[in-house]
């Protein structure tokens, strides 16, 4: 979809830690952790030359940086983690995980709930308040009704991607940049 097209203009997606085998983000990522249909285990798969990535992992418990191509040093990695977390009760845990993964460049699509504790914990470098409501796709690729809440795309930890993020997302809604460090 268009959100992923914009994300890929900022940087290539290296990892989708909470993907699904039918999700477009999981197909675009070099590697993803996805929930198997018969269990609650998550399986890492790679679509590139790294076909030996077949581990049972939990996206909330597995360190993300080692799964990206090459080493990550001082948050200068161009390849990023794209996170579209479950929007239910698990969202708080995913927000804490994203905040903790400080060695990864992360772009996340989340509900724009700026008044919540989990949002404050995210503390994005920048975020775009998307104009309108996002329409998600079902497993067949059919567009569903618009989300009943506003959405935001957040950039976390990756100050080196800030100018590109602003350039790409400013046409989709206002972009807010953190002024404290």
Q: Which sequence ranges carry the predicted segments?
A:
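Class I S-adenosyl-L-methionine-dependent methyltransferase catalytic core
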Residues: 1-181
């Amino acid at each position: 979809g268009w959100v992923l097209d914009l994300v890929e203009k900022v940087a290539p997606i290296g990892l989708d830690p909470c993907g699904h085998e039918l999700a477009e983000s999981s197909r675009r990522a070099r590697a993803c952790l996805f929930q198997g249909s018969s269990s609650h285990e998550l399986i890492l798969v790679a679509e590139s030359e790294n076909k030996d990535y077949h581990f049972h992992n939990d996206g909330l418990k597995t360190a993300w940086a080692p799964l990206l191509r090459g080493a990550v040093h001082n948050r200068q990695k161009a390849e990023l983690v794209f996170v579209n977390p479950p929007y239910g009760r698990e969202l708080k845990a995913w927000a804490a995980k994203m905040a903790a993964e400080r060695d990864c460049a992360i772009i996340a699509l989340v509900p724009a709930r700026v008044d919540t504790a989990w949002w404050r914990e995210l503390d994005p470098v920048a975020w775009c308040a998307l104009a309108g409501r996002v329409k998600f796709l079902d497993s067949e690729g059919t567009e569903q009704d618009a989300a009943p809440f506003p959405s935001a795309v957040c950039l976390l930890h990756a100050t080196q991607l800030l100018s590109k993020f602003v350039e790409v997302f400013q046409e989709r809604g206002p972009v807010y940049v953190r002024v404290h460090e």
